[in-house]
Amino acid sequence: MKQSEIKDLSAAELQEKLSQTKKVYADLKMAHAISPIANPLRIRSVRRTVARLATELTKRELQ
């Protein structure tokens, strides 16, 4: 998810997207721990998306 897409979301949508993305990240980590997944770089991508969403949410709360 690109930064411009994240900025277009409302605060409620950010919260929802963040929880969904965290669940995907946890599922990927679990799947990779059990047996290596086909594309392990997806874990990094999802982790960075979680960080982007959390950063934007915090930024909005501070304003």
Swiss-Prot record:
Gene3D superfamilies: 1.10.287.310
Disulfide partners: none
PROSITE patterns, alphabetized: RIBOSOMAL_L29
Taxonomic superkingdom: Bacteria
Molecular functions per Gene Ontology: structural constituent of ribosome
GO cellular component terms attached to this protein's record: ribonucleoprotein complex; ribosome
Key words of the record: Ribonucleoprotein, Ribosomal protein
GO term, biological process aspect, one: translation
Keyword hit for rRNA processing: no
Family label: Belongs to the universal ribosomal protein uL29 family.
Official protein name in the record: Large ribosomal subunit protein uL29
Organism: Flavobacterium johnsoniae (strain ATCC 17061 / DSM 2064 / JCM 8514 / BCRC 14874 / CCUG 350202 / NBRC 14942 / NCIMB 11054 / UW101) (Cytophaga johnsonae)
Lineage: Bacteria, Pseudomonadati, Bacteroidota, Flavobacteriia, Flavobacteriales
Name of the encoding gene: rpmC
